[in-house]
Amino acid sequence: KTQNTDNLAICSLVYETLTELTDAFEAEPGLFTEWSSDDGETWTFTVDTERAFHDGHVLTAQDAAYSIRTAMASSLYASRLGAVKEVKDNDDGTVTVTLSRANTQFPALLNIPVIENDAGDSAYPCGTGLYTYAADHQSLTVAADHPDADKAPVEAFYLAEYKSVEEITSAFDNGELDLALSDPSSGTDLTFSTQSDQRQYATTNLQYIGFNTNSSFFMTARYRQPFNYVVDRAFAVALLHDCAVASALPVHPASTLFDSSLNESLAYDLDKAKKMFDDLKIVDYDGDGEREYMPDGLSPLDISLSLIVYAD
């Protein structure tokens, strides 16, 4: 149920997912071992029934189906699963998911944690991950029955609760914390006074500029187009301490769906933007050094921009 980034990282140690994502954001088997679909709308997934939860309960199709339904009711996953019409567990150890519209990439959306059937209200539901909660829930220890137990990088993770960024940075600087997550694009951007070793990993978090299409200027699509070439995305990446990648497309450059040629054609280019504004007759009509537009062909109007940061 957690929405906290740090807690989600802990969950990934305890709970495994139905599918996993490669570095290219393609789906690969997790607790679903294989899947198929003839039309992109009805999908059949095979559950790895050789796996078991930390309490010994063997994973079933009911558990997998319940986990999907639980995710559908969660604000964290509801959007990505919005097209799911029906989830059915079958006696042969498979799960059938029916969508309201075809999506050939649907398995990539199922990297959601798996819990036991009807365990959604439990404070600490059992998982199938490499680590399990200790009896006092203050640490995570290696799950002895996990297939990769002998490959665990550390024997235990000790958990501590901190309620603010200041508390986290102070604990890290004082040596109370060994690991901390920092996201420069959010309120959890951490700055440490001591030397630290940083590791980065790719996400699908997207920072973008949206236009108010109800405004008198931006309601016109051709007026919005030049602004694509005005945004210096590389500069924005630098502001995020290089913890991001620039893309003119709503797709990560590492993804197999990324179109390099199209991305290059939409890259930052002030000269192209100026020409587009000129062609649209968005020019400096009154000599004040600023461009205006003339929707009625008679009176030039100033272009006023108000930027609002929306972090949801």
Where does each model-flagged region fall?
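N-terminal lobe/hinge region of extracytoplasmic solute-binding protein
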Residues: 1-39, 69
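Append "and occasionally in soluble cytosolic enzymes with long acidic Gly/Pro-rich linkers
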Residues: 220-312
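A structural "hinge/loop" feature
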Residues: 1-11, 31-32, 57, 105-114, ...
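Gly/Pro-rich hinge or "lid" segments in bacterial periplasmic/extracellular proteins
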Residues: 5, 98-161, 166-167, 270-271, ...
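Extracellular/periplasmic solute-recognition and catalytic clefts
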Residues: 88, 134-139, 158-215, 225-226, ...
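Short, well-ordered beta-strand elements
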Residues: 1, 42-45, 67, 95-97, ...
